Amino acid sequence: MSLVVRNLSVDHGAIRAINNLSFIVEKRRLTAVIGANGAGKSTLLRTLSGLIPASEGKASWGEHNLLKGKAELHVRNGVSHVSEGKSVIPELTVEENLDLGALWRKNKKEADATKKYVLELFPRLGERLKQRGDTLSGGERQMLAIGRALMSKPQLLLLDEPSLGLAPLVVEQIFQTIRDIANTSDLTVLLVEQNAMGALKIADIGVVLNLGNIVAIGPSADLIADPAIRAAYLGY
Amino acid sequence: MEKLISASLIGLSQGAIFALMALALVLVFRSTRVVNFAQAGQAMVSTYIGWEVVTRTDNYWIALPAAALAGALLAAIIETFLMRPLAKRASHGAIAPVASIIASLGVLGVLHSGAAMIWTTEQKLFQSPVSVNGIEIGSTVYPFSQADMLIISTVIIVMLIFAFFFQRTSLGLSLRAAAFQPEISRLAGVRVDRVRTIGWALSGAAGAIVGVLVTPGSYLSPFSLDILLVYGFVAAVIGGLESPQGAALGGLILGMSLSFTSIYVSSGLTFIVPFVVLLLILIVKPKGIFGGGNSRNA
């Protein structure tokens, strides 16, 4: 299984948000897509999870064509997407938010096992199961969003800016958790981040996007070492 | 004392009806953002179905679920074949915020004239399964009948079933989630389109039950339930338009204000009261008692 994106283009009306993008993410790799605001990072994830249509090209996860069918069906094929901005439902309790991710799963025993795993991963959520989503701190909300995505037992996890709006210490925690999840499971992770340094540090592979085009791609250690990338994207 | 008891009991019975009608409107509004003027027409057509059943079988207890089923089906059809394509096609430009409202008015018109064609505009008597005469205790006759008791108990049971369904079942959770955050729900695997149709169907059933509860003892015509739309909206707005609990409370507040005004002040004021209550709420607390931002109820 691998994520294969070939010649993918996506338009927002007259504006080309993603231009002829091609890359492959191998199974169990953690890949970070970095780039400035408007580089097309969120658009890429939203296209892969079926929220918006592509204009041209191909994208597949294993044998599943990601450009066909609705988002609610993609998740059944092993693709979970945590959208930008702590994607939890504030009106629902923590437990309801988690359960939501597994409602479609037929095997309730397996779903319960996943829930146990998620609560071991995020014990703070376990202490707050009956609280409403909007009573959580920013970091806890992000954990809940990731937890909800894991409840669908994904093979491919798409994460959109998990560090957004979080305090530096919390950002570090979230990144570490993402790395831990990738290390201890079969998950393939595609992480989109404006916090380029933080993301590249935990990633195996880095993809640098600029205005919808790939500028650089390679092992993230190489990208961090590249003076041009450092100057343009890592800020030193 | 008798006055007080009468006013409270009538208020309770009327309030129950308004509450259920408000719930029907809230279920549609919070899941699809449609202010559904057709609700009165849907309830009316469903009540005619109930009337057909009751005249054939002479059994109200078959007519009630039959009407509810018809109401659910009719609502699901309207959502699937009109509102859903409309939301997709008329999603941009000046028409977007009003398209569904105008469409719902259109549906109301179609249902009015359709019912008039099928059943004529002649008023039909809907037999009540219980007495509609005031209950006599000692020498006083209270303006409160067995039919009122039937209304109150049925509405309470229906509300409890809805509450259980929404709070305790998986499908109920999907409905709430899809109402609040359709995109996140989609990403979590909720089939949002399907769930919305179910929301409309539940609303249609609630409206149908209103019609079949309120009509017995009086007459049914294509326009006889239209006034409930007004009361239902006022009750829904009092409750914040999005909250089922708010709808219940809004209905009760409206029912009580109407009955107390008509018994203590003048029955001539009953047409003004709902609008006064509505204006007060809109000016003092425009988001309603349960409405607004973070305080909205799941």
Q: For the regions a protein language model found, what residue spans apply to each?
A:
Chain A
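Conserved ABC transporter NBD signature motif
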Residues: 57-65, 77, 110-115
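Conserved ABC ATPase signature
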Residues: 132-136, 140
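Helical segment within the ABC ATPase nucleotide-binding domain
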Residues: 172-186
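ABC-type ATPase nucleotide-binding domains, specifically the catalytic core motifs of the NBD
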Residues: 13, 31, 94-112, 121-126, ...
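The feature captures the beta-strand-to-loop junction immediately N-terminal to the Walker
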Residues: 34-36
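Conserved structural motif at the start of ABC-family nucleotide-binding domains
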Residues: 3-5, 18
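Helix-to-loop junction immediately C-terminal to a conserved catalytic motif
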Residues: 49
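ABC ATPase C-loop
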Residues: 149-150
